[in-house]
């Protein structure tokens, strides 16, 4: 049974078999099962159509669905039938967003909101610490909404809700000239990277998902024959400025008998698939139509006005049926066996660039895109193993705690380099009957950066039963309103009730994360969640690729620890094993830098792009002066750019000090720590790799 058939059977109970077929239908490719309603509706929600830039959407619609005509304001119109009655069925494509309002001398962007509309009270906050795209005349440019580093905000009082004045944008530039070279100009639209469509169990989601599904219904109905009279289908512009596009289109039509508009509703307690109401004399209804009112059709949605607004597929079908009815279509050609929706092209993928950083960026991306909340490190451990050179892969061992260890060289004067495999995230603590999943944090993070974003629940290996999913998609449930920045509790929802979740194997202790996709930022920068410590792991791998183990003069231990973010648990276990014999330990981890206009530079100031960093002082250890001088001399002798600084936080190597082991932290400067958009400079990571190699082979 296809997903559409499963969902359209309104009110039917989903058995475990139906749930599993639902999950696997949505994860298989179109070549396996054909495209699903998820696929079609996701594309409609993903359309970029900022106010004034709706052509980005209408170009695609006209290319894939012939028969539309575009007017001077960008409205699309398609007519079916003739005579009376004359009906208009309309839906607006644009949705609220941001535009570049300032480009600073340092290459940062400031924003202005564009248009109006019903958005969530935490709308601005949902963008903080998230991936963005700048829509330029030459295409999309990746960017991030900046956020204060978690490590540098300790012991500060409760923060107020984020507002537009708090939003800064980092595009990987260091000057206005850099911004210009990226093709960014004043007033360019700025959108959330993943506000476009995505799907989870029985739902599609994204910014204004309900209205976008309504637009898909209008476009689908526009391809059908009406039974009597004439129906004019409109996909309009400038909704965010009072439906100016709709008003202009209606003026061009003269007298009509009926106007139906698919739009948002202020009522969030709807019990039916959609609400239908008559609106008397709206400002955008011209007298020339001869009407005093219009009909507004509002789809039922969850989490209205947020970036994770969700509409069920069954409600989407009901909405389409009602649009057809109001359009005068009594015998639609579409079949309920296959998805009925008009198709659109897939959004263009960002091309990987080829330059002197490609190899480093490629390895880093593979590691950073792995999901491994503290205590669930299997995925990142496998990614590290795959990236190791053959000699290290052969020598690699996983201990009983999950640490990955590589030993090489003669058995004397051992030196250890240690990075960690885990990342901050969440674990399930309770599953309510209604499907709401309570979570606890794993590691130090700001829950506000996850609230109102996509959620992924990860099942733990071993995966012996191929009939069960490995991941479930859902949402981090947003508060309906707030006066403080941080939520008191974190909850996720995956589109299923508690019994269905448990039938799929959801239990307390499973990891939950947001989605992520690492990417280049500007000419030399890189952004991802979990650069702490996938960047350290990458530097260690790159150094290992340069090492010839047969030429080593002493024992070299390369280690990747587990559960660092939750108390150095893996490192403590390794300290018990190696502490009595190892002479030096170098922990490879982030130097949380204050190189950001959001931070004070009196502390932790190590600018990005100026080299690797020695963590001379942090919360857990201090570098011995003689060892610090030795490292600086080695770096100078090999022209490795190296900085020294003091920051907050602690690292794996600090636990070895109690055994009498010399410990120094080796780092790269990083911005926006423990957020979804950590940023580094690839030049610094390459300098760190060279430093690790130099120390590994030093006498």
Enumerate the language-model features and the residues they cover:
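N-terminal hydrophobic/helix-forming segments and targeting peptides
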Residues: 6-18, 23-699
């Amino acid at each position: 049974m296809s997903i559409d058939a499963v969902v359209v059977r309104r009110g039917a109970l989903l058995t475990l078999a139906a749930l599993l077929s639902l999950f696997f239908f949505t994860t298989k490719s179109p070549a396996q099962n054909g495209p699903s309603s998820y696929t079609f509706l996701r594309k409609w929600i993903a359309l970029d159509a900022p106010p004034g830039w709706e052509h980005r959407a209408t170009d695609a619609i006209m290319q894939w669905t012939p028969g539309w005509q575009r007017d001077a304001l960008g409205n699309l119109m398609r007519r079916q039938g003739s005579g009376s009655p004359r009906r208009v069925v309309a839906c607006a494509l644009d949705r609220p967003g941001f535009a570049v309002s300032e480009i600073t001398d340092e290459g940062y962007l400031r924003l202005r909101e564009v248009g109006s509309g019903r958005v969530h009270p935490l709308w601005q906050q949902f963008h903080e610490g998230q991936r963005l795209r700048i829509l330029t005349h030459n295409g999309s440019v990746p960017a991030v909404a900046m956020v204060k580093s978690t490590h540098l905000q300790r012991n500060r009082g409760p923060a107020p809700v984020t507002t537009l004045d708090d939003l800064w944008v980092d595009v990987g530039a260091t000057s206005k000239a850099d911004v210009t070279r990226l093709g960014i100009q004043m007033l360019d639209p700025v959108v959330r990277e993943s506000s476009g469509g995505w799907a989870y169990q029985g739902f599609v989601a994204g910014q204004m998902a309900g209205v976008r599904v309504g637009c898909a219904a209008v476009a689908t109905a526009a391809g059908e024959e009406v039974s009597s009279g004439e129906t004019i289908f409109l996909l309009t512009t400038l909704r965010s400025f009072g439906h100016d596009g709709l008003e202009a289109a209606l003026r061009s039509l003269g007298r009509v008998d009926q106007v139906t508009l698919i739009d948002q509703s202020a009522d969030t307690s709807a019990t039916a698939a959609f609400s239908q109401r008559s609106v008397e004399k709206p400002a955008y209804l011209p007298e020339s139509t001869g009407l005093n009112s219009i009909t507004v059709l509002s789809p039922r949605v969850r989490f209205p006005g947020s970036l994770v607004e969700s509409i069920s597929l069954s409600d989407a079908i009901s909405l389409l049926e009602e649009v057809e009815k109001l359009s005068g279509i009594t015998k639609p050609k579409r079949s309920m066996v296959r998805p009925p929706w008009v198709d659109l092209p897939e959004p263009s993928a960002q091309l990987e660039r080829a330059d002197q950083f490609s190899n480093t960026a490629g390895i880093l991306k593979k590691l950073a895109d792995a999901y491994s909340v503290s205590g669930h490190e299997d995925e990142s451990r496998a990614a590290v193993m795959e990236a190791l050179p053959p000699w290290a892969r052969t020598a690699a061992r996983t201990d009983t705690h999950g640490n990955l260890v590589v030993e090489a060289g003669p058995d004397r004067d051992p030196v250890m380099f240690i990075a960690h495999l885990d990342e901050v995230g969440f674990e399930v603590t309770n599953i309510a009957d209604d499907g709401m999943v309570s979570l606890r944090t794993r590691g130090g993070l700001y829950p506000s950066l996850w609230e109102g974003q996509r959620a992924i629940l990860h099942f733990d290996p071993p995966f012996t039963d191929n009939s069960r999913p490995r991941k479930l998609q859902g949402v981090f449930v947003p508060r309906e309103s707030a006066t403080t920045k941080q939520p008191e509790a974190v909850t996720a929802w995956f589109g299923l009730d508690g019994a269905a979740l448990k039938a799929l194997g959801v239990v307390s202790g499973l990891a939950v994360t947001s989605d992520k996709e690492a990417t280049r930022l500007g000419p030399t920068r890189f952004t991802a969640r979990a650069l702490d410590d996938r960047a350290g792991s990458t530097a260690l791998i790159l150094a290992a690729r340069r090492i010839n183990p047969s030429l080593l003069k002493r024992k070299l231990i390369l280690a990747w620890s587990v559960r660092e973010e939750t108390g150095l648990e893996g490192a403590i276990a390794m300290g018990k094993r190696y502490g009595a014999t190892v002479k030096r330990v170098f922990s490879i981890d982030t130097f949380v830098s204050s190189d950001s206009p959001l931070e004070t530079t009196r502390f932790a100031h190590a600018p990005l792009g100026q080299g690797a960093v020695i963590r001379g002082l942090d919360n857990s250890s201090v570098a011995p002066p003689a060892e610090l001088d030795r490292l600086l001399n080695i770096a100078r002798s090999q022209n490795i750019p190296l900085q020294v600084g003091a920051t907050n936080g602690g690292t794996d190597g600090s636990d070895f000090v109690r055994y009498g082991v010399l410990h120094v932290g080796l780092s790269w400067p990083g911005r926006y720590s423990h957020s979804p958009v950590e940023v580094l400079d690839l030049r610094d990571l390459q300098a760190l790799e060279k430093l690790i190699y130099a120390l590994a082979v030093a006498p």
